[in-house]
Curated annotation (Swiss-Prot):
This is Phospho-N-acetylmuramoyl-pentapeptide-transferase. Keywords: Cell cycle, Cell division, Cell membrane, Cell shape, Cell wall biogenesis/degradation, Magnesium, Membrane, Metal-binding, Peptidoglycan synthesis, Transferase, Transmembrane, Transmembrane helix. Its cofactor is Mg(2+). It catalyses: UDP-N-acetyl-alpha-D-muramoyl-L-alanyl-gamma-D-glutamyl-meso-2,6-diaminopimeloyl-D-alanyl-D-alanine + di-trans,octa-cis-undecaprenyl phosphate = di-trans,octa-cis-undecaprenyl diphospho-N-acetyl-alpha-D-muramoyl-L-alanyl-D-glutamyl-meso-2,6-diaminopimeloyl-D-alanyl-D-alanine + UMP. It is found in: Cell membrane.
Length: 377
């Protein structure tokens, strides 16, 4: 628990003081956001606001994680050090963040809202996602556990194992599955990042949920994962430290990103956070639960899919005034802050529901008994 507080605190400090320094650098070089002309007219006042703030978030997370482990090794050497699972989570986050950085830089250099091509972005994300998918199935620990498995997971691995098709085809199917998750999460966070503080606040809630999930898993590991209520998860405590660092860094960034935003996270931040989200789903064996815990991101993404699909099928008609969903409410006259706070509430309810499902599953596997219930008899 001390490590979690340390990681969150360090992430907060690094971010809240590092972000204004980044703002000055970006402003000095004229690295400001270019606003779409077809977006809400109220957004034109945001033109020129420094972007690429995701650099501050991602670097703060990495720094908080490393410093936490440095202090832990010196103070409590028995707690263990940096793990492969933690590094893989950070690696996917940084890899996707780098794609976002290239996208942001191209927009800035062209001085218009046109970054990497869709095909170019897909190739880069696919390469990074594929590398992650392969790595998580190798490098077993002393007990023979790899960071992830080829089984589709809900609150734990299910009986559906992609390895049924054989080692080669199973690996290919798993790579495709992980890329679907990573593509979905990166695009979902990117679409949500349309109002000041919206994606930042929602991400704080989602990663707080994952911090609690992995912390719970760390307390309920067992040698035989087939036993009731045990979790076959590798290095969950270290994943919880990464999640805590993310929460702290995002809170620090929100100080500057709340309305009126002094800086935007840009694609650097949204794609990086999406990568981290995908990593947690795969490494904590909660891939399908991701749809619930990140429910706000899913709803906003679905609003775009429905809008585009209906527009094509109806030859020009629309379901919403504008997509993503947050812009629909803007055009209905809602204030930006009102939309953001209400969407945060919705995000929090999704996270709470996911935690309820996760804990409910544990109770079912534990025969319905609460921890320590035997002490009451």
């Amino acid at each position: 628990m001390i490590q979690l507080l340390m990681a969150a605190g360090l992430g907060l400090v690094f971010s809240i003081f590092g972000t204004p320094a980044l703002i000055k650098v970006l402003a000095r070089h004229g690295y400001g956001q270019y606003i779409r002309d077809d977006g809400p007219t109220s957004h034109q006042t945001k033109r020129g606001t420094p972007t690429m703030g995701g650099v501050a978030i991602l670097l703060s997370v990495v720094a908080a994680y490393l410093v936490t482990h440095l202090i832990s090794v010196l103070a409590w050497p028995e707690n263990g050090g940096i793990t492969l699972s933690g590094l893989l989570a950070l690696g996917l986050m940084l890899g996707m963040g780098m794609v976002g950085f290239l996208d942001d830089y191209k927009k800035i250099s062209k001085k218009q809202n046109l970054g990497l091509t869709a095909a170019g972005k897909m190739v880069l994300q696919g390469a990074i996602g594929s590398a992650f998918a392969v790595l998580v199935l190798f490098f077993p620990d002393a007990a023979g556990n790899t960071p992830a498995s080829t089984a589709i997971s809900w609150t734990r691995d299910t009986g559906v194992d992609l390895a049924f098709a054989g080692p080669v085809v199973g690996l290919i199917l798993f790579v495709v599955w992980v890329n679907l998750i990573a593509t979905g999460t990166t695009n979902a966070v990117n679409l949500t990042d349309g109002l000041d503080g919206l994606a930042t606040g929602a991400s704080i809630l989602v990663f707080s949920g994952y911090m609690l999930i992995t912390l719970w898993q760390a307390g309920h590991l067992c040698e035989n994962a087939a036993q009731a209520a045990c979790y076959a998860v590798r290095d969950p405590m270290d994943l919880s430290i990464v999640a805590a660092a993310l929460v702290g860094a995002l809170i620090g960034f929100l100080w500057w990103n709340t309305s009126p935003a002094k800086i935007f996270m840009g694609d650097t931040g949204s794609l990086g956070l999406g990568g981290a989200l995908a990593a947690f789903a795969v490494l904590s064996r909660t891939e399908l639960l991701l749809v619930l815990i990140a429910g706000l991101f899913v709803v906003i993404t679905m609003s775009v899919i429905l809008q585009v699909g209906y527009f094509k099928l109806s030859h020009g008609k629309r379901i919403f005034k504008m997509a993503p969903l947050q812009h629909h409410f803007e055009l209905k006259g809602w204030q930006e802050v009102t939309i953001v706070v209400r969407f945060w509430v919705i995000a929090g309810l999704f996270v709470a529901a996911a935690l309820g499902v996760f804990y409910g599953d544990w109770l079912l596997h534990n025969g319905g008994a609460f921890p320590g219930a035997e002490a009451l008899h």
